[in-house]
Amino acid sequence: MIMFLPLGRISLGILILFLTGGNLVSVSEEIQDRMHAVAVLSPKESTDLSLPTRKRQLLDATETGRRWPLRRRRSILFPNGVRICPSDTVAEAVANHVKYFKARVCQEAIWEAFRTFWDRLPGREEYQYWMNLCEDGVTSVFEMGTQFSQSVEHRHLIMEKLTYTKEAESSSCKDQACGPELSSPVPIGETSTLAGAVSSASYPGAASERSAASPQESISNEIENVTEQPTPPAAEQIAEFSIQLLGKQYSEELRDPSSALYRLLVEEFISEVEKAFTGLPGYKGIHVLDFRSPKENGSGIDVHYAVTFNGEAISNTTWDLISLHSNKVENHGLVELDDKPTAVYTISNFRDYIAETLHQNFLMGNSSLNPDPKSLQLINVRGVLLPQTEEIVWNTQSSSLQVTTSSILDNTLQAEWLSADESITTTTTTTISPFGFSSGPPSATGRELHSESTLGDIVSTPKLASPSKVVLSSSPEVLGGSSLTLHSVTPAVLQIDLPVAPEGRTSGSSILEDDNTEESEDVSIDVLPSSSLIQPVPKETVPPMEDSDMILLTSSPHLTSSVIEDLAKDITTPSGLDSLASRVSDKLDVSPWFPDTSVEKEFIFESGLGSGSGKNVDVIDWPWSETSLEKTTEPLSKSWSEEQDTLLPTESIEKLHMYFTEQMIEPSAHRYGDGPIYFTEEESHVRSTIPIFAESATQPTSLISSKHTSDVPDIDSYSVTKAPFLLATIANTASTKETDEVNTLLKKGMVQTEPSSPKGLDSKISVARPDMQPVWTILPESDTVWARTSSLGKLSRDTLVSTPESADRLWLKASMTQPAELPPSTHSIQLEDEVIMAVQNISLELDQVGTDYYQPELTQEQNGKVDSYVEMPTHVHYTEMPLVAQPTKGGVLSRTQTAGALVVFFSLRVTNMLFSEDLFNKNSLEYKALEQRFLELLVPYLQSNLSGFQNLEILNFRNGSIVVNSRVKFAESVPPNVNNAIYMILEDFCTTAYQTMNLDIDKYSLDVESGDDANPCKFQACNEFSECLVNPWSGEAKCKCHPGYLSVDELPCQSVCDLQPDFCLNDGKCDVMPGHGAICRCRVGSNWWYRGQHCEEFVSEPFVIGITIASVVSLLLVASAVVFFLAKMLQAQNVRRERQRPTNRQPDSLSSVENAMKYNPAYESRLAGCEQYEKPYSQHPFYSSASEEVIGGLSREEIRQMYESSDLSKEEIQERMRILELYANDPEFAAFVREHEMEEL
C-alpha cells in the first residue's frame, strides 16, 4: 500500500518553504483553517477510510498538528557535519549552515519520494541526479513529488496492486466527480499561454486542496451524463485490534513514525504477529496504526493494528456480531486451539485463537515479543469497497471520454488519494508560445497561479462555453482500421513554472474512414516575434490516403521559401501541416525530468507540433521503465530578445529535412541557463507564425517510424507508412560576439555545423521508450549539433558534440532521420497499462546497466563523426532495504562504471525448519539432501533472471533456524549494482517459496554482498573457537581451529577434551591453555604421582631413591674408569714417544759428558741424585730408535764395546751407559750438561 505519512508530508513542506522563500505564516494559517474545518468530524469518521479524500486530508493535518509539540529538539547547537572554523566569518558560517540545510532537506525528500511513490530506494546515479536538481534549486520538493506521482513506474505499482483483487465490480464515485465521460469547458475569448501540451497527474493532496479552495472554478455549466452504478458488496474487511506487549518500555520516540525505533518495532511486531493470522482463510495483510502508552500501568506498550481479510472469507453476520459485541467478549476458554478456524468465525474462538497462537509462539521461543493474550481486544470491523479503475483511451473520431473498466483499485489507495481518473481536467484550445519563456526567475504571479488555481485551471479563468469533451480512446474503426489502442491513465494539471513537453496530440487534420477531413480547432503558436518581413503562406490540406492497416501522417506536399530574398517568412499554419501546428486535443504535460533553463541567442528548432497521428503518447518515465521507442515531436522555444527583430543571415541552407524524433530522459549533472523557465500569460488571437529558412524547395518525403519492444502476445500494433509529409527543421542562429554566418549543410543524411573542441557536456544518444516524452537538451556555449542518418536502412540517432566557441547555446531536440527511399517497417508496441504477472526478468537490464560508451573529445581540426554511447538503465524494484545515507553531490556527476566482481555472496534464513548437528557435516545425508533442495530451487530462479550466471554454491548451513550461506559465480564481470538485483530476486523468491513450497524465509535476513566488497569470513560458520583465514590468491575463506580445538566431520571447532574423553589417562584432568593447546593435569599422591603428556607414567618415592643411588654409583664407576683409561693412555703415549726420539749426537758429545762428570766436582756431588733419578728406569730401560743416533751415529752396542775395551769396571760402564741414554732422552739433562760444560770452559 502506497501512502503518505502525514507527519513526513507536513514537516517536509515546512522545511522546503524555508528553502524556497515561502511564507511560514500562510502555511500555519492554512493548517489552522484545516484544523478548524475538521472540528465537526466525529471520531468514527476520522478512522473511516471510506470518507471522501478531502475530509481525510483535513483529519491528517489535524492529527499532524497534535503531534508537532511532541517532536524532540536537538540536544546540540549544530548537527553533525556543520562546523564553525575559527577563520570563518559570520557570512561564511551562515552560508555553510544553509548549504547543509539544503543538503539534508534534499536527502530526506529524495528518500521519501522514492519510498512513497516507487516503493524502493534510489540507485547511486538517480540519487545523485535528484540531489543535483534539488540543491541547484531547479526543482522544489513539491514539484519533485508531483513528478514522481506522474511517473509510469508509480502507476505500474498501482496497477500491480490491482491485479491481486478478486472481484471486478464497478463502484460509485461517491463525493468525487467522475463518470463514463469527463469534460472540461472550452475557453472563448481568453486563452492560456503554454509551451506544449501534456497529460500528467499532480500531487493528490495538492489537487484536492486546490479544488476545495476554489470549487467554483472547476464546476461546469453543462449537465454531465453521469451514470451511477450500484455499490457492490464489501470486497475487504479490515479488523482493528489492540494488544499489549509486555517487557517493552514505551518512549516518546514511538509517537514519530519516521523514527528508527518506531520502524524497528513495527517490523518486529508484524513479523511475529503475522504468524498468528497467516493460517486464517482470506488473510491479506497487517499494518500497525500506532503505539500507545498503557493507561492502567506504565509498563508495556499498547499496539493498535489493523488486519485485512478478503470479503468472502468471513460472513457479514459474524462480522456484525463481532462488531456489536467487541467489548463484551466472553472468555469461554481455548477451544480447539490446535485446529485453525474455518472460513466463518464465532466471537469467542476467533479472539481466543489469535490470543492463544501469539502466546504459544512466545512460549515455544519463536517470538522475541511477549504479547499479553488477555489484553487482545477487537476494536472495530469495517468493510471496504474496491472501486474499479477506468481505462481512458483516445478516440480521434468522437469528442467524448470513453471509460472502460479494466481492473479494481485498492480500497486503501482509493481512500488515501484521488484516483488518476478522478482528477482529470482538460483544455483543448490554447495559445501555444514555444518562445514565450522568460529567462528570469519565476514571478510572483506565476507562483500565485500555481498555488491558488484549481486542478483544472492553467493560467486564467476563461469564459465558459459549451464543453468540448476530451477523447482519450482510439478504436480500430477510427484509426483507419488499425489494431492499436493506446491507453492513458494519469492525466493531471500543468505546473506553471516547469518546462513542458507534449504527451499526446492529433494531426492538424484528422483523416477519417469516409474520406472526410475534420478541421482542427484554432491553435495559435507564437514561435518568433512578428516583424515587417514576415509574409503569409496559404493554408493547405493534404487529401487522405486509405490504408486499412496504416495510420497516415499528413503534411503539406511541399514548402518553398527563400532566405536570400527575405530573412524570415510569416507562415500561417495550415491545418494539414503537422510540423507547424496541430489540434491540441489533449492536456498539457509538464516535462519533469530536465532542469529549468533559459535560452540565449542561438538555437536549433525542430518543429514537430501536431506530427502525431491521433495516438496518445505515454507519460514520461525517467530511465527505469521497460518500454520502447516513442514517436512524437515537440518544439521548444526561448525568450526572444526584444532588441532583435530580425534573424541573423545565414549563408546557405540546402534543404529542409524531416525528422521523426525520439528522446530518452538522461540525468543531467549540470544546470544550464541563468534561471528556470516559466510560462507567462499572453493575450494573442492571431494565428501563429513561424519564420522558416529555406533555399530550395524540398520534395515530399516519407516518414518511416519503427518501434522496438519485446514481443508481447495479443497487443495491438500499428505501422507508419510512406505519406507526403514534411516537418520543417528550423535553424535560427545568432551570436553575441560574431555576426558571421553559420553554414548548415545536409550531406548524405547529415546536418552539421562547424565543430570545435568540446566543452563540458558528453555527447550521447538515447534510446527512447513509449512512456517517455520528447524533451529538449540544452548544450553549453560552443557546442555543435550533428544529425546523423543511416543509408543502410537502419534508423540512426542524433549525437551532441562540441561546437565553435563563437556560437552561443544551442537548443537541440534529439531526432531520428530516415531517407525517403527506405521501406516502411512495422513493429509492435507494448501498451502502457499492460501488467505482466510473471517473475521479473532483469537479465537484459543487468547487461545494460551502466554500459556507457564515451565518445572521444574532438579538437578543432577533427570533423569526423563522433562515437556515441548508449545508456540503458535498469528497472530494479526492491523494498525494505536498510536505509543507507548516500553522499550528496560532489561536483560533476561521475558516470564511470567499473567492472564488478565475478562472485556474489548472499545468505538467507529459513524460519520454519529446525537445525540439526548433521547440517554441519557436509558429508551427511541430511546436509546433501537440503543442499540439493536449495540448489534445485535457487539455480533455475537465478539462471532465468541473471545474465552471465554460472553456478551457485551452497557454502554452509548455520544455526539460527537454518541460515543458508551461498555464493553465486558469474561467467563475466557483473555491474556494481548487481547486489540490488539479486536482493530483489531473492525477495521475490521468498514470497514464491512460501506460497508454493512451504518455506518461510525471513526476507529481513537477506544479505547480499559482492565478491570485491564482501568479507568471505562473514559467510563461514566459524565459531568462537576458530578463526577465519582468507587465501589472498583465491579469495577462499576457511575456518582454522585454535590450538586445543579440533573440527570433526566439518563440524564447528570443539575442545579436544570434549572430543577425546580418554585424552588424559589415570584420572588426569584435561584443560585447554589458550595459545598452547590441550594439557593434562596428572594426579599426585604422598609418595607417588603420574606424569607424561597423557599421565601415562606412574612414579613412587622409594623407586626414585633407588634410582638416584644407582645413578650416583654408576656415575662414580664411570668416572674411575675414565681416569684409569686416561692414565694408561698417557703412559703408553710416553713410551711410544721415547722410542721414537733419535739417539745420535755429535762425536764429542760423549767425551764432553764424560769430562763433565769426571772433572766437574758439582756433577760428582750430584751423582747420587742422578742415580736416584735414573733408578726407576733401570728396571725398565727405555730403548728408542732415536738413541742410536745420539752419539755421533754410534749405536749402543758399539759404545758398550768401547767401554769394555777400556779399564773401566762393569758397573762404571753401565753407569755411563745410563748417563748417555739419559742425555739422549732427556733434553733438560742434556741442557744441564751443556751448561756446566760452558761454565768450565
UniProtKB/Swiss-Prot annotation:
Compartment list: Photoreceptor outer segment membrane; Photoreceptor inner segment membrane; Secreted, Extracellular space, Extracellular matrix, Interphotoreceptor matrix
What GO terms fall under cellular component here?
Answer: cell projection; extracellular region; interphotoreceptor matrix; membrane; receptor complex
Keywords in UniProt for this one? Cell projection, Disulfide bond, EGF-like domain, Extracellular matrix, Glycoprotein, Heparin-binding, Membrane, Receptor, Repeat, Secreted, Signal, Transmembrane, Transmembrane helix
Source domain of life is Eukaryota
Q: Low complexity bias: where?
A: 431-443
Q: Which residues are glycosylated?
A: T193, N225, T231, N297, N316, N366, T429, T430, T431, T817, N841, N945, N959
Span list, region Hyaluronan-binding motif involved in chondroitin sulfate A- and C-binding: 1128-1136
> Looking at the record, which segments are called Hyaluronan-binding motif involved in chondroitin sulfate A- and C-binding motif?
1210-1218
Q: Which residues form the EGF-like domain?
A: 1013-1054, 1055-1096
Membrane-spanning regions, if any?
Answer: 1105-1125
- Where does the signal sequence lie? 1-28
Q: Where is the composition biased (Polar residues)?
A: 211-229
Cytoplasmic topological domain ranges are 1126-1241
Give me the ranges of the annotated region Hyaluronan-binding motif involved in chondroitin sulfate A-binding. 255-263
Q: What does this protein do?
A: Chondroitin sulfate- and hyaluronan-binding proteoglycan involved in the organization of interphotoreceptor matrix; may participate in the maturation and maintenance of the light-sensitive photoreceptor outer segment. Binds heparin.
Q: What is this protein called?
A: Interphotoreceptor matrix proteoglycan 2
- Gene expressing this chain: Impg2
